Structure formats: C-alpha cells, structure tokens
Amino acid sequence: MLGFITRPPHQLLSLLCTGYRLPQISVLCTQPRPRAMAESSSTSWELPLVAVCQVTSTPNKQENFKTCAELVQEATRLGACLAFLPEAFDFIARNPAETLLLSEPLDGDLLGQYSQLARECGIWLSLGGFHERGQDWEQTQKIYNCHVLLNSKGSVVASYRKTHLCDVEIPGQGPMRESNYTMPGYALEPPVKTPAGKVGLAICYDMRFPELSLKLAQAGAEILTYPSAFGSVTGPAHWEVLLRARAIESQCYVIAAAQCGRHHETRASYGHSMVVDPWGTVVASCSEGPGLCLARIDLHFLQQMRQHLPVFQHRRPDLYGSLLPLS
C-alpha cells in the first residue's frame, strides 16, 4: 500500500504539516485495492516517497521560483526523493508576446537556479513545461514547451518537448493556439530510471492521446507524469477521468502536478494535482489552492497488477497495428 495513504494515522500527517506556510498537505484515498493485491513485500516506510507540487504561476519568474523552492524544500524535509512541478512552473504570461519575451534557453539563469535547488536539497525534480528557447530560436522565433528532469546533483538527465500542441476552442474557456508561439517536439523520450521508478515524460494535452502512454509503458515506464495547466471548464469534466484512464490502460502510476487559481486577469487553472495508482485509484491529491501532496510508489504492487491483468500480452497488433518501439 502507499504508506502515506492508509498506514500512518491522520495525526501524523497533521504533525508533518505543522508550521507549513502554504495550505496543508492533502491526501485522498477513496477506493480500496483488491485484497489479493493489497500487500507489498516492503513496509510502507521503505517505499520511495514522491511529492506533487501545485502552484499559481504569474508573469513574475522570481516570485514563482520562490514559491516552487519553498515547496521543494518542504518536500525534501518530508523525505521525498522526487518532486514534480506543473506545466509553466516558470511563468504564465498575459499574452504570446510576453511569453516569448520571458522565455529562456535551457542553459539560462532560471534553470540554473532550479539546478542549484535540486543539488542543495539532494532531490530529483520533474520540471514540467519550461518555456524553452531552443537552438532554432533565431530562425523560428518560437519556443518549445519542454519537460526537464533534473537529478539530485542538478544535472539534466532528460528533456521532452511537448509533441501535441493545444489548439482548441472550448466554450466558456476561450480559445487557445499554442502553435502560434510554440514548436511541436519531434520525438518521445525513453523512460528514465529514478529513485522512484522508471519515469515517462509527457505534458498536459498529451494525456488525451493514449498511444503515447502505451508506447512509454511498452518502453518500460512505471510512472507516467503529466504536468498540466488545465482550464476551469475542461478540468472538472476531463481531468480525473483522463488521468485514471491512462493509469489503468498503461498499468503505470500517473503523477499530474497542476497549475491552480487565477494567474492574471484573463487566465485561471483548475488545480487538483493527483497521483493515481495502476489500479486507477486516486491515492493522493491536492484541492484548489497552492500546496503539495505526497504518495509512496509501490513497484511490487505494480508488478502484481501486470501479472494479474496481463493486458500487454493480450494485445492484437494483427487487428489494429502495433506501436513502433522508441528509438
């Protein structure tokens, strides 16, 4: 079982949060696991702990960094080995022109600050959705939506550029044309071995394309991560449903750090960051405000799930084609 979900008493969670300036950690467990698969070979305290951070980014990059740093430091204090930050953790601008103006290359000052933070805290960081000026910036004058994974030494171990750009018109939420200022990525990133398990990288809108999650799972992913900035209309309708579906069909943990609240006068995000286990249970979640939630990753439970429900062995590529392996 996930240690912070059922085994520690609620009083312990309250003690862990004492003195925390941001809203209290929220942990949710709503559905029991099947009895035959509920026991782990490890005690809960031996399982790796991850932290999912929820923030309200603004156009002020340094204020955003300060908020994220406080959450990462708190996650470190609580014993997390890996902290997940949402899409646009660096900033959310008022318009495309400001987005381009505030963007930086991966070797810029801002990512250097996060690298130092990871190194000082001794924690891995999933930085989902960095506004990156790529090597083709001078030619395209467009950026990449880049998910960066830092190890505990502050080194970049993987970077994935969002492949599915969000060009949509949602009634009541307003139009979005990410492709007006963003270039699509050209490849998926192979899953990366971390202290919590093998992590497959994706970003927000990617969760609507199950082929991506299946391909990452086939490549060895045990954890899929979807840092996001869902809106106030699509969030209540689709957010949890999509994340649970991706977890069930891929038989992976799904970790989704989210933006929340009002960023400026024209944009707000849904929040509700969460962790979903391979059974499809929401095992940890935040509410609507800034803060973090914690979960323990039980890879023994994941392997049990895959043995009891061997769906990848039952696939019929002769009927509907096969997914090409990651290069």
From Swiss-Prot:
Catalytic activity: N-(4-oxoglutaryl)-L-cysteinylglycine + H2O = L-cysteinylglycine + 2-oxoglutarate
Catalytic class of the enzyme: hydrolase
GO cellular component: cytoplasm; mitochondrion
Pfam family membership, one: CN_hydrolase
Keyword Nucleotide-binding: no
Chain ranges of the CN hydrolase domain: 47-299
GO MF annotation terms: deaminated glutathione amidase activity
BP-aspect Gene Ontology terms: amide catabolic process
Residues forming coiled coils: none
Chain segment of the transit peptide: 1-36
Catalytic residues (positions): E87 (proton acceptor), K162 (proton donor), C204 (nucleophile)
Superkingdom of this protein's organism: Eukaryota
Key words of the record: Cytoplasm, Hydrolase, Mitochondrion, Transit peptide
Cysteine pairs bridged by disulfides in the record: none
SUPFAM superfamilies per the UniProt record, alphabetical: Carbon-nitrogen hydrolase
EC number: 3.5.1.128
Tagged with keyword Acetylation: no
Entry function: Catalyzes the hydrolysis of the amide bond in N-(4-oxoglutarate)-L-cysteinylglycine (deaminated glutathione), a metabolite repair reaction to dispose of the harmful deaminated glutathione. Plays a role in cell growth and apoptosis: loss of expression promotes cell growth, resistance to DNA damage stress and increased incidence to NMBA-induced tumors. Has tumor suppressor properties that enhances the apoptotic responsiveness in cancer cells; this effect is additive to the tumor suppressor activity of FHIT. It is also a negative regulator of primary T-cells.
Family: Belongs to the carbon-nitrogen hydrolase superfamily. NIT1/NIT2 family.
Extra remark beyond the main annotation: According to Rosetta Stone theory, the existence of a fusion protein in one genome predicts that the separate polypeptides expressed in other organisms function in the same cellular or biochemical pathway. In Drosophila melanogaster and Caenorhabditis elegans, NitFhit is a fusion protein composed of a C-terminal Fhit domain and a domain related to plant and bacterial nitrilase.
Record-given protein name: Deaminated glutathione amidase
Name of the gene encoding the protein in the UniProt record: Nit1
